[in-house]
């Protein structure tokens, strides 16, 4: 009975085609490059989707917000518009009074 399954009993032995190692390595390299390319495309699509989902503001609304901010927030760096700070509220004036020197320094 074991003789029936031998190749000389009418069965044809089929072997896979022999592929050289170079072809296998080349195919593997091409597969890796294709996977890297797909990964780059996926990350680019994800970044574009995030950018598209970001909330947008029109130029008109941005201008209105800027005007509203500049007219409502006091900026004492422009004293012609908002006036000078009283000395007790000016932290830089207090700092200058504490650190008054005669103009000489000693380096040791």
Curated annotation (Swiss-Prot):
Which family, according to the similarity comment? Answer: Belongs to the G protein gamma family.
Keywords of this protein's UniProt record, alphabetized?
Answer: Lipoprotein, Membrane, Methylation, Palmitate, Prenylation, Transducer
The protein's name in its UniProt record = Guanine nucleotide-binding protein subunit gamma
Topological relation to the membrane, as annotated: Peripheral membrane protein
List GO terms (cellular component aspect). Answer: heterotrimeric G-protein complex
Where in the cell is the protein located? Membrane
Q: Which residues carry this modification: Cysteine methyl ester?
A: 105
What PANTHER family does its record include? Answer: GUANINE NUCLEOTIDE-BINDING PROTEIN SUBUNIT GAMMA
Complex and partners: G proteins are composed of 3 units, alpha, beta and gamma.
| Record GO terms (molecular function) | G-protein beta-subunit binding
Q: Single Gene Ontology BP term? A: pheromone-dependent signal transduction involved in conjugation with cellular fusion
Covalent lipid attachment of type S-farnesyl cysteine occurs at 105
Q: Which Gene3D superfamilies match?
A: Transducin (heterotrimeric G protein), gamma chain
| UniProt propeptide residues | 106-108
Q: Note the Pfam families from the entry.
A: G-gamma
Lipid anchor (S-palmitoyl cysteine) at which residues?
104
**Entry keyword annotation includes Magnesium:** no
């Amino acid at each position: 009975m074991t003789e029936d399954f031998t190749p000389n009993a009418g069965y044809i032995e089929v072997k896979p085609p022999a592929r050289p190692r170079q072809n296998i390595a080349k195919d593997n390299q091409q597969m890796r490059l294709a996977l890297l390319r797909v990964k780059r495309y996926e990350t680019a699509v994800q970044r574009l989707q995030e950018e598209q989902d970001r909330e947008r503001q029109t130029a008109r609304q941005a201008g209105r917000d800027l005007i509203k901010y500049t007219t409502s927030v006091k900026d004492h760096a422009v004293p012609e518009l908002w006036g000078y700070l009283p000395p007790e509220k000016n932290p830089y004036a207090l700092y200058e009074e504490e650190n008054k020197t005669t103009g000489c320094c000693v380096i040791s």
